[in-house]
Design a protein with these regions (language model features):
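A short glycine-rich, His/Asp/Glu-containing loop-to-beta-strand
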Residues: 1-21, 27
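Double-stranded beta-helix
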Residues: 3, 7, 65-104
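Conserved hydrophobic/aromatic positions in well-ordered beta-strands
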Residues: 9-11, 31, 77
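Short, surface-exposed charged micro-motifs
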Residues: 10, 55, 65
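Residue-identity detector for threonine
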Residues: 12, 51-54, 78, 99
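A short beta-strand-loop-beta hairpin characteristic of the jelly-roll/cupin
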Residues: 18, 23-54, 62
């Protein structure tokens, strides 16, 4: 993991908690679900359920969000790899309640 930028982080979401849509510029984000149940979704694509053991590598420049399911805590490890000069995050609009509440 020599190319990991910023180290590994442990992130916990309470039920119904999710982050805004966001983009990781010039870096790949890796999510590893370690507990609970969550969601991952790329802009314009169907949501993906995350359960313990699910690993998702998010390519640079892909707009996405992730967070807990309505009735479950969600914990994931995350790190960035292939980090290039000028890498950063762009935070976008919230995931609207209607979209989130329609997830099953």
């Amino acid at each position: 993991m020599a190319d990991v930028g910023g180290g590994v982080m442990n992130v916990t979401f309470e039920p119904c908690c999710r982050n805004n849509w966001h983009i990781h510029h010039k870096q790949v984000q890796v999510l590893i679900c370690v507990a609970g149940r969550g969601w991952y979704q790329e802009w314009g694509k169907a949501p993906v359920e995350m359960t313990p053991g699910t690993v998702i590598a998010i390519p640079a420049e892909v707009k996405h969000w992730h967070g807990a399911q309505k009735n479950s805590w969600f914990q994931h490890l995350t790190y960035h790899k292939d980090v290039q000069e000028g890498a950063g995050n762009e935070w976008c609009e919230p995931v609207d309640d209607d979209t989130y509440n329609a997830l099953k």
